[in-house]
Amino acid sequence: MTTEYLDEERDLPLPRQKKGIDHTQTEPIRGFFGVKDMFAFENVGFTRSSEGKRYLVCGECEQGPVGFVDPVTEMNYVSPERLDVLPDVAAAAVEAGK
């Protein structure tokens, strides 16, 4: 399994949207771990395409999004920040899995 770290900032929709607002509220998130096969992540599902974008969600509670699918490369990226995992801990886990 090939894993990569994407050190870029991307806007992800907020997990909870305020009512009465006519657009999707987002927040900038920096740093994502990516794999080609989304099933390499435990308990991750994906949303239907919205505005040409697909997002990854928790497979157990369906909270999210916790990441996104790159439409060009079809890589699946999750944010350690959204998973409450420290980037150093996640990086060590990825390194150990190589």
Swiss-Prot record:
Cellular component GO terms, alphabetical: cytosol; membrane
One of the GO biological process terms: small GTPase-mediated signal transduction
Coiled coil region boundaries: none
GO molecular function: guanyl-nucleotide exchange factor activity; zinc ion binding
Function, as annotated: Guanine-nucleotide-releasing protein that acts on members of the sec4/ypt1/rab subfamily.
Keywords: Guanine-nucleotide releasing factor, Protein transport, Transport
Family matches, as InterPro entries: Mss4, Mss4-like_sf, Mss4/transl-control_tumour
Family matches, as SUPFAM superfamilies: Mss4-like
Residues of the MSS4 domain: 1-86
Organism annotation: Caenorhabditis elegans
Listed Acidic residues bias regions: 1-10
Name of the protein: Putative guanine nucleotide exchange factor MSS4 homolog
Annotated segments matching region Disordered: 1-25
Family, as annotated: Belongs to the DSS4/MSS4 family.
Superkingdom to which the source organism belongs: Eukaryota
